[in-house]
Amino acid sequence: MTAEPVRDPFEALGDPNRRAIVELLAAGGGTGRSVQELADALPISRPAVSRHLRLLKEAGLVREEPIGTRRIYRLHDAGIEAVRAYLVRVWGESAARFALVASNTSPRARDGA
């Protein structure tokens, strides 16, 4: 049985190892890292890092660039920006609802002032 490809970035980010990979790539300042460099920095094997990178790539969060015989992985700006924009929108909606509830339950609102 073949696993279904991960296309949802939030599903991809649901794994702590994949989040660690994203954090390492973000900390690199855009220079990118090879599978071996990532494996050296994580408590998982090189094949496991490769599998996680494949899922992150399918979700649009990571891109790969062949350089010589190596593949260098970097964050995919468009994918990361899409996640950020979604979170900003959801946070804004939640904050607006909270402000509405808070204003309706303040002592002044309850007392009719």
Regions found by a protein language model. Give the residues of each.
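N-terminal helix-turn-helix DNA-binding core of bacterial DNA-binding proteins
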Residues: 2-45, 69-81
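Alpha-helical residues within the helix-turn-helix
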Residues: 40, 51, 57-58
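Beta-hairpin "wing" of winged helix-turn-helix
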Residues: 57-67, 74
